[in-house]
Design a protein with these regions (language model features):
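Flexible glycine-/small-residue-rich
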Residues: 37, 126, 276-278, 297
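Short aromatic/hydrophobic contact patches that present stacked aromatics
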Residues: 92, 228-230, 294
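C-terminal engagement modules used by replication, chromatin/transcription, nuclear envelope/ESCRT
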Residues: 288-296
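Short amphipathic alpha-helical segment that frequently serves as the phosphate-/nucleotide-binding helix
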Residues: 16-20, 139, 169, 243-246
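Nucleotide-state-sensitive switch-loop elements of NTP-binding domains
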Residues: 2-13, 17-135
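Conserved residues at beta->alpha junctions
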Residues: 10, 37, 95, 156, ...
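C-terminal accessory "lid"/substrate-recognition subdomains
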Residues: 148-154, 158-288, 300-303, 307-311
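Conserved C-terminal guanine-recognition region of P-loop GTPase G domains, centered on the G4
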Residues: 83, 98-184
Length: 311
């Protein structure tokens, strides 16, 4: 059976960054790997960040999340059926940072997928700089996306103090308890180190972490009602201007509660990936991009966001 791994994590936690390393590690073991990338909204930005994996023999399939739950499940099921026919040994699924993991497990239980796929690892990425307070919906997603994880990786450890890392672990534990989930993570199940220092032994340990069956008390809400995305195409703004203005969005209540900003900008003939959360902004060179910026959050005011970006 094809092993299928799930990499979860809330918006901006660092799933795509880890996925690149994880998929490349499996390819380096001689395993035929395919990544199924699923982004929140109608434009799949994260897929562009994985282009370099193709040079390492990793294939990439995408699903855009700008649709209702039933349509999304049908699209995922169709993709998985197609991928099962192509001889992959391992499929790595990266859902959006706003994702009901029960939806994924329901799809895997469907025929004929239940005869072709076997759940391998569930890996949860949690930001070491996780905000102290989140909305009830965000707290639920944090918990539900981590409950089945065999391993939790803290991201941005190089930027966090020991107290902040411990705070992120405690926050996750509180979120799980609030959802009446019995899952508790022991010290050996949490990896809290700079990802630049991850060794081959670390990757091998993660690659066999497995999963734990757990359940959370369901919080019923429509992801697309609780969370929104605002798209800005062809803004024509410079990299310097965007890097100056994007951080202010996170503290401007008139914009709504901004959780993540991502997209691309061209500067001097070089494309850059912009990725921002309340913890900070990064700009990394990439081979190709497109003039798009996506803001994800709660109660967003698109007109106000555009005004702030262009000021």
């Amino acid at each position: 059976m094809v092993q299928v791994d799930l990499i979860t994590g809330f918006l901006g936690a660092g799933k795509t960054t880890f996925l690149r390393r994880y998929a490349a590690w499996w390819a380096g073991q001689g395993v035929k790997v395919c990544v199924l990338e699923n982004d929140f909204g109608a434009v799949n930005v994260d897929a562009m960040l994985l282009q370099d994996l193709e040079a390492q023999g990793v294939e990439l399939e995408t699903i855009s999340g700008g649709c209702d739950c039933d349509t999304h499940q049908r699209r995922m099921r169709t993709k998985l059926i197609s991928m099962a026919m192509r001889g992959f040994e391992r499929v790595i699924v990266e859902p959006s940072g706003i994702f009901d993991v029960d939806e994924f497990f329901d799809v895997l239980r469907d025929e004929p997928l239940d005869r072709w796929y076997q759940l391998g690892n569930v890996i949860a990425i949690v930001d070491a700089l996780l905000p102290e307070e989140l909305s009830p919906q965000a707290e639920y997603i944090l918990a539900s996306e981590s409950a089945w994880a065999g391993s939790v990786l803290l991201s941005r450890c190089q930027l966090a103090s020991d107290a902040q890392k411990q705070g992120a672990e405690a926050h996750l534990a509180r979120a799980l308890e609030a959802c009446k989930c019995s899952r508790k993570f022991g010290p050996k199940e949490i990896i809290a180190k700079d990802w630049a220092d991850l060794t081959g032994d670390d990757m091998a340990r993660i690659a066999k972490c497995g999963y734990r069956q757990a359940s959370c008390e369901k919080l019923h809400f429509e992801e697309h009602d609780a969370f929104a995305s605002a798209y800005f195409l062809e803004l024509g703004l410079s990299r310097a201007r965007l890097e100056r203005n994007i951080p202010s969005l996170f503290g401007d209540a008139a914009c709504g509660r901004v959780l993540r900003v991502k997209g691309f900008v061209e500067d001097g003939g070089q494309w850059y990936e912009l990725n921002a959360t309340a913890a900070g902004l990064t700009a990394a060179p990439i081979p190709q991009g497109q003039q798009v910026l996506i803001v994800i959050g709660e109660g967003l005011d698109k007109a106000r966001l555009e005004e702030e970006l262009k000021r």
